[in-house]
């Protein structure tokens, strides 16, 4: 399980970078033309779930190095996705907000529950020896990370900041509760903790 999250948390270059850019473009196009099917496809191929679950996992086992790499790559993915979607919507001739865009601007309590239990499903699936390859795409669809990011890009590109803040808040909620559920279940599994000799570093974790 540790090796899985080390790969997910540390690898953001080459293929993953281009996959993220393509996923962002697909999601932006789907939001622009109001196509739920296209948006779902973008959520399935986006690699942004890896660093988020890597953050929760690294906190659960006190792996400070993995935490730093996961946070760094999460921030990089966030910046790349926001920049790509903002650029797309800036040059897109379709400037009207579709119902799919509007749906990502008003987070509810249900979004919190979906993110929490979606993240829980992800860590449970990864902890199995026969890791079910259908679970992680399902989690990505349920928790919907890419659409809020692209909606935030739409808000920036069009100067409609209520779209940006509403969508960013939804993305933030999803991120926090996916990481939280991963952390809780990692602790529940009682995986081996990384020994930390420096008290200050332990406090940071």
Please identify what each model-predicted range represents.
Residues 1-5, 198-202:
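Short, small-residue-biased leader/transition segments that mark boundaries at the very start
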Residues 56-69, 154-162, 184-193:
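A cytosolic-side transmembrane-helix exit/cap motif
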Residues 3-115, 128, 132:
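Alpha-helical transmembrane segments and their membrane-interface boundaries
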Residues 81, 86-95, 167-193, 197:
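Juxtamembrane and boundary regions of transmembrane helices in multi-pass small-molecule transporters
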Residues 7, 11, 31, 126, ...:
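Generic secondary-structure signature for well-ordered alpha-helical cores
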Residues 43-51, 143-149, 199:
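Short, proline-centered helix/strand-breaking motifs
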Residues 98-186:
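Hydrophobic alpha-helical segments
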